[in-house]
Amino acid sequence: MKRIMYISTTTRKLTDEEVEAIGRKSTVNNAKVGVTGVLLSANEFFFQILEGEEEDVEGVMERIRKDPRHQGLLILKAEYEVTNRLFGNWSMNTVRLDGMSDMLMQAVRIMLENITETHRIIERYTQPAVLQFMTEGINPLTVPVKKTEQVILFGDIVAFSYLSGLFPVEEVAELVNLFLDITSKKIAEHGGQVTKYVGDCVVAHFPPDRADDAIKACVETLREIQELRQTAGQCRLQKYLYCGFGLSKGPVIEGNIGSSIKMDYTVLGDIVNLAARLESLTREIGKGIALTEAVRDACGESWSFVHTGDFNLKGQNASQPIYSVNDPAVVDMKNFQEISTIVSELCCELT
């Protein structure tokens, strides 16, 4: 059997009658498929434990995910090969904690609130792959390191060190967060996973058959940033936000890397380093995307690829052809020298 524990919040405040109705309906539906459990309700929080055959539990969870009264569903734990039920006599017992004066019940309500808040915070600092393992009932620390094929994305802000020395620290931090937010959302929308942030850099990976999606994430990011530049005021740092992306494809080491103090679930290898070299190359070729022949050949969609030349990149044994994409947002690129010249001219005008 399978057991799932989750927390969710309600999209609006529910009355006692509505919560009781949810409990009654759940009891009837769960009894039909042999699912047992308990539902705790405290203010806007639902905490529920479901147990039964895996297919039946997943069916109940699918209905819950689609229920418009739930939002922010967070699976705390999933257990497989469960042999004994914790709530064998309850198809769904509902416990309403609101309004109870009993100190124990109040403590439980506060605990649920704190658990939810803590998990939401941890989510923001944790790689999606690690969260996925946890929701599947897998201890991430036990996942073995493996060799796999991936499309690697490496991106960062052009002339960041120079710009960060000219503008207020608050505006610099805002710019980095903005860049990482836009890029990360595009990566996630197209099926990639952010592996890590290193200063103003983002490292992500896509499955080997999703090279098109990796390019889409880069192109759409560049388009959105181009729009930001066009609408920003002359003295705003966003006016000078340019970024570059390197895309490579090949074998990487994927898994837990770190120490007893701090672990990362990440990717390592020559292909990751190559993506970083390609990102740096974008300044030289004057285009926001630089990608390898392997990435180009893995694409299934009709892209307007441009051969930017053959380059002998650091760490590579021989020169190799490098490509970009012919898109207005991709070719709207400036290097460090061009950005510093624009900023210097602006400073002269202001003084």
Language-model regions: role of each:
Residues D16-A21, E55, L274, G286-A290, ...:
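Catalytic cores and conserved motifs of cyclic dinucleotide signaling enzymes
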Residues G37-A42, Q193-Y197, L237:
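Short beta-strand
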Residues T142-D213:
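Catalytic NTP-binding/metal-coordinating core of nucleotidyl cyclase/transferase enzymes
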Residues L228-Q238, F245-P251, E279-D310:
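A short beta-strand->alpha-helix segment at the C-terminal rim
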